[in-house]
């Protein structure tokens, strides 16, 4: 089941089409091919590859810096999304903030201060979203993302892939096996913001599904705190079904102080794709 065996190597080819995004369409941009060996493309072969073709291959040590950059930038994007857009997913918090604003008026009798109250609340949400997400990012960068080779490439049942376009790493995804549940967990999926909308994320997701099927796992699971609807549509287009949801999820690195609980809330959604009956 080790991911470095020839049977588990993926030289997935993606014809990058700007119009083929994550939506399920009849036009399929992903061409699957099984290479005769696990050797990476040599420079001569790489020159023959069109610039709009992406190859998905296993992680190599030289990818570490770019992989961490893509992961870092992808997580940092969640700060404003969680602080502002995420508020629409928290009706109880909206009610509480409205109540605080009304209380401000009754206590101060100042229209100006009352008008400033929502801005202060939003500023506090941004501050605590940044604080919590940076703490989470620090935890990740000092655990599995600190040594991808040791954490994902060496253990049985785990693997890490990168999507490469014109010699540049543009996307990442990991698979972590859970033998006790006979499932693979899809983790760390992210695509460079400059290359989104080309079907790369969908191809990375399919690579994890292919890995799970080849190794006879019963299902693939994932958990996401993504606020954007596009991320959830991506998982659903791959065949995942929602199995649960937590409205007040605790991220690693959270202190759960009263102020943090007041100004930071995040929804965690769990998905599962059943590959076969056990």
What role is predicted for each listed range?
Residues 9-10, 41, 128, 138-144, ...:
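Conserved catalytic-core motifs of GNAT/GCN5-like acyltransferases
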Residues 59, 189-191, 224:
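Hydrophobic adenine-recognition pocket in adenosine-nucleotide-binding enzymes
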Residues 12, 75-80, 85-98, 102-187, ...:
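Acetyl-CoA-dependent GNAT
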Residues 1-53:
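Cytosolic, low-complexity regulatory segments enriched in Ser/Pro/Gly with interspersed Lys/Arg
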Residues 212-224:
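Conserved GNAT acetyl-CoA-binding A-motif
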Residues 55-66, 93-94:
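A short beta-loop-alpha structural element at the N-terminal edge
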Residues 188-193, 197-214, 233-237:
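Conserved acetyl-CoA-binding loop-helix of GNAT-fold acetyltransferases
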Residues 68-71, 75:
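Hydrophobic alpha-helical core bundles mediating ligand binding, dimerization, or RNAP-core interactions
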């Amino acid at each position: 089941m080790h991911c470095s065996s020839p049977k588990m190597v993926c030289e997935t080819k993606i014809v990058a089409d700007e119009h083929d995004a994550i939506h399920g369409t009849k036009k399929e941009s992903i061409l699957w091919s099984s290479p005769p060996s696990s050797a990476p493309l040599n420079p001569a072969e790489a020159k023959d590859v069109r610039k709009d073709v992406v190859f998905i291959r296993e992680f190599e040590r030289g990818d570490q810096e770019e992989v961490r950059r893509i992961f870092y930038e992808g997580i940092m994007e969640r700060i404003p999304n969680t602080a502002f857009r995420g508020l629409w997913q928290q009706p109880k918090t909206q009610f509480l903030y409205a109540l605080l604003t009304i209380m401000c008026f009754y206590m101060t009798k100042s229209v100006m201060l009352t008008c400033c109250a929502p801005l202060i609340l939003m500023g506090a949400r941004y501050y605590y979203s940044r604080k919590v997400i940076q703490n989470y990012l620090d935890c990740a960068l000092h655990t599995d993302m600190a040594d991808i080779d040791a954490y994902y490439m060496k253990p049985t049942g785990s693997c890490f892939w990168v999507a490469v376009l014109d010699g540049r790493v543009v996307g990442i995804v990991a698979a972590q096996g859970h033998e006790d549940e006979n499932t693979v967990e899809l983790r760390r999926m992210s695509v460079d913001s400059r290359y989104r909308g080309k079907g790369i994320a969908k191809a990375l997701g399919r690579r994890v599904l292919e890995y799970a099927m080849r190794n006879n796992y019963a299902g693939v699971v994932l958990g996401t705190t993504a606020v954007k609807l596009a991320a959830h549509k991506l998982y659903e287009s791959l065949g995942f079904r929602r199995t649960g949801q937590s409205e007040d999820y605790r991220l690693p690195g959270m202190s759960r102080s009263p102020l943090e609980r007041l100004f930071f809330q995040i929804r965690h959604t769990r998905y599962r794709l059943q590959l076969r009956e056990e």
